[in-house]
């Protein structure tokens, strides 16, 4: 712990952070539920939320539950990509009860919750003390309390803790607000997809733009889209680097795998001539309007058979198909190309396609804003903690 000051600090703070043992800050929490709380105050450690319906435990067993007061921390020993040996979570939602299988600690003094919620949860800070005070349990890692309390951590003054906690809470609130906006936009899109495309055999949708009343025409997807095998666009090297120019895509959820410096075998999609990459096995798909390469041949590249059709409308028609693959087989030729869909006039296609393009652009903008806020918080954590 040679470096005892963070890279970024508020004005007026210059003292080194003090090395403290966790035993100066926390003690083992042994409080049990003596009928203070019912099942509606059961806390989920995974999400730090109250489970008003409880967790399935009988009322008789609640007496064995641990009481988790506001400010207490619980050790959750499941490992993950983010937390290699488990993690601590701080109760900032109010007094409640939790499963007795989790180890909990209680502060020995008044401690700023907003600061410690972030600090004791931060893997780069907590990894070392957790590694040196856990053992492998039956279902997850278990905390050896005495060994943990003997570990040390660097701590700023209480006033600096308050400042840092206030800033990180502000960022968290911005992230939460933008996440709510994004979730709302996605729900709105789901609703529009349900109402602006025919369903249950109908030839017209429930919701239409003014001036359109004609029935939609039935077509097979194979009549709408041409497909191209992607073999010649497969990337040769998977040594990706963000400084390279050409994106490497997959039709799966991750979509962008990285960037390559290969200059041959590039699919030159453009805004004027986009394509859909269709995963032949999972049936996932993405709209692409920029040059790219791909990772594997397990997809089809789809383009319009009739360029007078609106591409974005047809893409959303494809995305709106409710189909869950039941086996590991290719789906475009054998199944999807035979699916019957409905298409309206070119003018109505244009209206609907433009509407969903604008909506998707708005969703992408909010996703980008949310990503930048999370990156901003990550930077604060790296530079404001020691």
Where are these regions (language model features)?
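Proline-centric
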Residues: 11-16, 103-110, 141, 146-162, ...
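A short beta-sheet element
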Residues: 53, 57, 65-125, 139, ...
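Non-catalytic DNA-recognition/assembly elements of restriction-modification systems
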Residues: 8-32, 208-232, 243-255
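Coiled-coil/CHCH-like alpha-helical segments characteristic
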Residues: 7, 50-52, 206, 223-224, ...
């Amino acid at each position: 712990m040679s470096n005892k000051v963070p890279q970024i600090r508020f004005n007026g703070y210059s003292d080194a952070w003090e090395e403290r043992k966790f035993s100066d800050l926390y003690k083992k929490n042994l409080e049990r539920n003596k009928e203070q709380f019912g099942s509606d105050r059961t806390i989920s450690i995974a999400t730090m939320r109250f489970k008003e319906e409880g967790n399935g435990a009988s009322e008789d067993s609640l007496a064995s539950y641990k009481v988790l007061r506001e400010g207490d921390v619980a050790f959750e020993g499941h490992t993950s990509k983010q937390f290699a040996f488990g993690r601590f979570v701080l109760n900032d939602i109010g007094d409640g009860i939790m499963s007795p299988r989790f180890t909990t600690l209680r502060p020995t003094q008044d401690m700023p919750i907003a600061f410690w919620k972030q600090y004791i949860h931060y893997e780069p800070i907590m990894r070392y003390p957790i590694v040196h005070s856990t053992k492998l349990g039956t279902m997850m890692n278990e905390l050896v309390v005495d060994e943990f309390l003997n570990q040390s951590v660097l701590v700023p003054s209480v006033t600096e803790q308050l400042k840092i906690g206030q800033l990180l809470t502000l960022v968290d609130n911005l992230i939460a607000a933008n996440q709510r906006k994004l979730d709302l936009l996605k729900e709105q899109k789901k609703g529009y997809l349900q109402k602006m495309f025919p369903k249950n055999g109908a030839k017209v949708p429930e919701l239409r733009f003014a001036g359109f009343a004609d029935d939609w025409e039935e077509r097979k997807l194979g009549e709408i889209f041409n497909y191209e095998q992607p073999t010649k666009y497969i990337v040769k090297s998977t040594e990706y680097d963000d400084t390279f120019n050409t994106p490497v895509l997959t039709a799966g959820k991750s979509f962008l795998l990285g960037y390559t410096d290969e200059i041959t075998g590039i699919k030159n999609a453009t805004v004027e001539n986009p394509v859909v990459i269709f995963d032949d096995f999972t049936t996932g798909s993405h709209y692409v309007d920029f040059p790219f390469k791909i990772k594997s041949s397990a997809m089809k590249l789809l383009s319009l058979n009739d360029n007078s059709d609106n591409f974005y409308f047809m893409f959303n028609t494809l995305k709106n198909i409710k189909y869950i693959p039941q086996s590991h087989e290719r789906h475009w030729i054998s199944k999807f190309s035979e699916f019957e869909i409905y298409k309206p006039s070119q003018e109505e296609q244009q209206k609907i396609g433009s509407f969903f393009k604008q909506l998707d652009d708005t969703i992408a903008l909010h996703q980008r804003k949310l990503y930048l806020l999370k990156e901003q918080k990550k930077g604060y954590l790296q530079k404001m903690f020691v």
